[in-house]
Amino acid sequence: IRKHFPDIGFFRLLAWQNPEKELAKVFLVKYKGKIIGGSICLFSKESAYLWFSGGMRKTYAFLYPGILAVWAPITYAYEKGYAHLEFMDAGLPFKKHGYRDFVLRFGGKQSSTRRWFRFSWKWLNKLLCKFYI
């Protein structure tokens, strides 16, 4: 997996911090007992946020694990009555991005309301935080 993930303790904390309120859920795509895909969904009020999804699309191409990893949170959010499902990290609207093209096929439209940039110069980050926050 090429993405950077928090430590497993982070996910345990999400699951057990408030047992009465669901904060996150991990969805797994399995084939013959092997995990071939999965996704992580976060929940807040009436919105669900697809934080990460992925699948072994080359090895198990005909099983479509990446699509199933996205479909599971969509179905779950609908069944639980969430008003929205937002795909996180779909990329900038003016750059070519395969994942964005993929998620837009599920319907809806892209809105980049939660976007941040990080620069290697600390002074520039501090300055921009003062304007933004």
Where are these regions (language model features)?
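A conserved beta-strand-loop-helix scaffold within acyl/acetyltransferase catalytic domains
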Residues: I1-A61, T75
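Active-site-proximal structural scaffolding
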Residues: E20-E22, G66, K96
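Conserved structured core elements
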Residues: F5, G66-I67
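Alpha-helical elements of Rossmann-like donor-binding domains used by nucleotide-donor carbohydrate transfer enzymes
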Residues: F10-L13, L68-A72, G98-D101
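Active-site/acyl-donor-binding loops of N-acyltransferases
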Residues: K80-I133
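Conserved acyl-CoA
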Residues: L68-H84
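Short, contiguous acidic/charged loop-to-helix segments that flank catalytic cores in large enzymes
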Residues: G55-Y64, A90-F94
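Gly/Ser/Thr-rich beta-alpha loop segments that engage phosphate groups in nucleotides
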Residues: M56, L68, K109-Q110
